[in-house]
């Protein structure tokens, strides 16, 4: 069946599916703006459709979406969005719905980078450019906007290795269907591979975590603690949500604050854990900058559908040996030593950062 016929069939239901995005948070309503964006490119009347994989995660609603929406509307574009609620099948349908609503460019935060490929290929073949947002989609026709996730992994491992150069390590990885989980682990491995080879570091537990769920990470960590009689010296957790689950498991054995734990994303709870000493490092990725870059790239694609012509883009070689045009932003590790960075950037308030922290015990609190 041709894509245009499928779109006709779902047009009438698109609005209902959007309104069905229930839960504590839903994507912001569509709105139109006017004028030129920060990139100097205008796209009056261009609709940018965003497919979120799971809008319930803190950062998407708080940081990423407002930045994308602002960039799109500043250039005169219109923003529409929907939420797949961690379902790859729903996301495929959502992509069709966005196009049926008139989206001229798509931003997709993929739930499953392989499952979404047919929808992406069909969109591109129908003249709708696709931006892979923060998660790689293995298609040379997409434009990829993210942080350097291999470097995120390196940053995590550097801080944990600094704290524990020898000992038993556990690796809590993200969703198996998400290329970022692989990128992060490869960066971590670069830092600790010699210590692993020499036997200084022993891998006593490693697992992927479905949909990066904190509650699953907690269960996984509890199982690794049991299997190793609590003899775990360090945990490389790939993100903050899972780090929260890890710390909860450690707390159950009175090990929180004693076993170094990594994370990333700059979640408020994680930054507070850094201040408290129960999380060693949180690699901060300023999602406001990521959203801005993606929104501006989408606006440029409204005017010129060639993904190789995006300002500031470079070529990125994927694990599948495809070359995609991309923008990779630089992350920053946050530890007790530089908490002032996120305060100065107004990323978090002092009250939230320092909750439960003894005044003067760490910088910024």
Question: Where is each model-derived feature located?
Answer:
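A residue-level marker of the well-folded mature domains of exported/periplasmic proteins
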Residues: 2-6, 12-16, 21-365
């Amino acid at each position: 069946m041709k894509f245009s016929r499928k779109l006709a069939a779902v047009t009438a239901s698109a609005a209902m599916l959007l309104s069905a995005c229930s839960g504590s948070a839903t994507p912001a309503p569509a709105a139109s703006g006017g004028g030129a964006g920060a990139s100097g490119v205008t796209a009056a009347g261009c609709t940018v459709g965003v497919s979120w994989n799971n809008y319930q995660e803190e950062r998407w609603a708080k940081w990423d979406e407002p930045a994308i929406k602002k960039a799109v509307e500043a250039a005169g574009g219109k923003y529409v969005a929907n939420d797949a609620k961690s379902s790859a099948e729903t996301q495929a349908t959502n992509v069709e719905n966005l196009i049926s609503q008139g989206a001229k460019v798509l931003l997709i935060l993929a739930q499953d980078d392989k499952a979404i490929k047919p929808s992406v290929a069909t969109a591109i073949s129908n003249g709708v450019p696709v931006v892979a947002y923060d998660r790689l989609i293995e298609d040379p026709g997409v434009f990829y906007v993210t942080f350097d996730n291999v470097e995120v992994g390196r940053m995590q491992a550097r801080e944990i290795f600094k704290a524990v150069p020898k000992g038993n390590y556990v690796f809590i990885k993200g969703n198996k269907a998400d290329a970022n989980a692989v990128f992060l682990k490869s960066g971590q491995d670069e830092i600790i591979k010699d210590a692993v080879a020499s036997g200084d570091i022993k891998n006593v537990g490693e697992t992927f975590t479905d949909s990066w769920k904190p509650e699953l990470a907690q269960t996984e960590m509890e199982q690794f603690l049991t299997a190793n009689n609590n003899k775990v010296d360090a945990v490389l957790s790939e993100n903050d949500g899972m780090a929260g689950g890890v710390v909860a498991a450690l707390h159950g054995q009175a090990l929180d604050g004693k076993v170094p734990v990594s994370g990333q994303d700059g979640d408020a709870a994680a930054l507070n854990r850094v201040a408290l000493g129960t999380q060693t490092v949180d690699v901060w990725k300023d999602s406001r900058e990521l959203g801005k870059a993606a929104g501006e790239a989408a606006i440029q694609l409204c005017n010129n559908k060639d993904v190789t012509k995006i300002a500031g883009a470079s070529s990125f070689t994927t694990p599948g040996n495809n070359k995609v045009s991309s923008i990779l932003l630089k992350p920053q590790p946050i530890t007790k030593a530089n908490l002032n960075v996120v305060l100065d950037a107004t990323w978090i308030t002092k009250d939230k950062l320092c909750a439960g922290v003894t005044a003067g015990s760490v910088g910024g609190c």
